[in-house]
Amino acid sequence: MTQDRRKICCALWAATSLCMSYAPRPSRGAAAPSRARASGTIEFRDVTKQAGIHFKHNSGAFGKKYLPETMGSGVCVLDYDNDGWQDILFVNSMDWPGHKGATNTYPALYHNNRDGTFTDVTREAGLAVESYGLGCAVADYDNDGFEDIYITTVGSNRLFRNLGNGKFADVTLKAGVADSGFSASAVWFDYDNDGKLDLFVTHYIDWSIAKDQYCTLDNKNKSYCTPQTYKGESSTLFHNKGDGTFENVTKRAGLHDPTSKSLGAAMLDYDNDGWMDLFVANDTEPNKLYRNNHNGTFSDVGVQVGVAFSESGRVRAGMGVDAGDYDSSGWQSLLIGNFTNESMSLYRNDGSGLFVDEEISSGIRQMSLQALTFACFFFDYDLDGRLDIFAANGHVSDDISVVQPTLKYAQPAILFHNSGNRKFEDTSAKVGPALQQPVVGRGAAYLDYDNDGDLDLLITANNGPARLLRNENGNQNDLLRVKLVGTRSNREGIGAKVTLTTSAGARLLRMVKTGSSYASQSELPLTFGLGKPEAGKTVSIEIIWPSGQKDSLSKISADQFITVKEGSGIIAARPIAVGKSTP
């Protein structure tokens, strides 16, 4: 437990609760016409209501202060019907036994109507299934061309197979991935590069209603206990056998660790050896960086590479996490959301096998110090080619202001703009009022729901309404969006690394990934911001697929969405829709 968290949780809370080489001929894709660009200041505008989204998370809280109540829930972005428009899945929890409300609460699948609005199709899709859901991860695990859904829960997790006709079937038991316990985040990735997606699921603590402990703030009322009150619970690794079933290989892979209390997880290739590694954010226990040993096993190198503890050697309360090349070095760095008074962590990968803690030098420490950050991720909201940072914040104790007035339960999100030279600036107040509205933030994801080229935001709130924030005027710069289709690799190219090179020689690295954030997942297509508009701008890209194959494409026009098939080059291209100031 960190000193800062001890001050809050113990002194103040009185021990309470709380990727074969191949080089196809150069391809331009579709010629990109001149765009009538939006102009003006970038604003993230709340369009939730007009988009037809009415999801509200149900924590099931009724006064008993069960710890899972304050942990949910996540959101996932997917194109479940392959129409080229991103859809949304919100994870929901439920009422506790014996305290059932008037209506059932389910996850919510919203179909993109292609006009700025969404329709709730949960029941028609076969997803109206109650569970105490916390997180989700989506991917085409059976390589049939349709994205499937995995939901983490307190209890039995659920795997819903996409039938390809707008409906899903619960195949949890048949697949063997129920994984009972207190699960939070999940990652679909191909750790053995066999072309089939495997599944990693984080577990938090050994908790059940029967094991619930009494913690109090004032010796009168029950409060949420801290994770130190409970034992940890090992995360799980499932190997995809290729026949629709999975095998639990956690112990064989060297990942069994019942001391960890894991919440967020990110897939990355931190050493650029072509094999997927895993980073796991732990709450009040050392973070783990599992290096892939190329033989079906992993080794924890978190301590030796410098990401297990803070710069001062303390454990933190890690929640969400993401990996990305924010300094354009060609190496993936790590971003972690932590507890109040710990600030966010930013570990820069220096390419030598070590990470450097740059939370202070980057400028993110001061502005994130009082925030309790759950979801966090890298994304390029202004398309200047540099990865920015988003953080969703919210405390875990609904009465924290009673014991520490300077802290609030509902907290505003934070948007950090990457100004170059490894520096960030807080621009939350410069992009409109929506991000300044305090919410009990938990999950978050980015997506281009309106296909205008820039990235919009989804934020969930604990026991509150979800929000869709449209990025307005964010597409004033040139860009390229890339979707991958694997052949030897998994169908969606998850784990593929794409390096874009501009005519000026700038190199941008992005990876197709699942998971990251907190209990959530952003869209799979990659977005490359290309900076100021230039007529006839072209770029080249190199793709390193999980199979090891390399595809090189040159003279690709900017301002389009291209689909690249492994070994075949560009198989589809369309111009990016013209951005507008209003939907």
Q: What is each model feature region?
A:
Residues M1-T16:
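N-terminal secretory signal peptides and thylakoid transit peptides that target proteins
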Residues E43, A61, I364-Q366, T406-I414, ...:
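Gly/Ser/Thr/Pro-enriched helix-cap/hinge segments flanking short amphipathic alpha-helices
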Residues F44-D46, T117-G126, K167-V177, G244-L255, ...:
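Blade-edge beta-strand/turn elements of extracellular beta-propeller
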Residues I53-G74, A125-A137, G176-V187, K231, ...:
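Repeat-based blade/solenoid architectures
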